[in-house]
């Protein structure tokens, strides 16, 4: 090879190594209830502080601001691909229920992935995302909003916004036990805009995550761990089974803490425990 060509070849090789060309990425979420895969039509034992048996009714959530973390600490946003159904403008609806069994509020369609593009680096070691809907999208009119904001059952009428997380279960003592998370203490209108005292947007960071090999586990049992799902409300101090973030709701502190939130307080509550990483071979 000519001596003149050697530097050019080396320079080309170095440029290829430093290339910022994109690659497709699919971040897989695996919903579980304790050590069992989440599934409509199944019963799950040992749930909550009373070790109760529950049947799933619904399990969905929105996520946004998804990013991968490099070994250097650099945060690399995932360019979410709009698909007209689950993903739009950086917002993704994860839908774990399939409309079977007791999951009658949903539909057969499901979505377990966040799909997009990232620079083709080889040193991604973590993932970050925010659970919920950004403020600027949260108070659109759910009746005419585009997908995925038009999902049936995810519009939170009493707050004029969306349910960031919807986890509904049926215990043995009552027909439903709810967990509906969203922005609360909101004033305003869809036309004029809203201001909310509590954003309730959990920020999640998972270290030791390889997007090519690992799955993001979402454990519903962690959300329910600190409450007795068989407890029947007295209609006075506790008006609804579960947590819908009503002012003074007694179940909410224990159900929001696993997502790193404090009830009726914007200060963080600590490290979230609902999301973790697992090798895909362990699914």
Residue ranges and their predicted role:
Residues 19-283:
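A short, solvent-exposed, low-complexity linear motif enriched for acidic/polar residues
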Residues 1-6:
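Bacterial N-terminal signal peptides that target proteins for export
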Residues 13-16:
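C-terminal motif of bacterial Sec signal peptides marking the signal peptidase cleavage site
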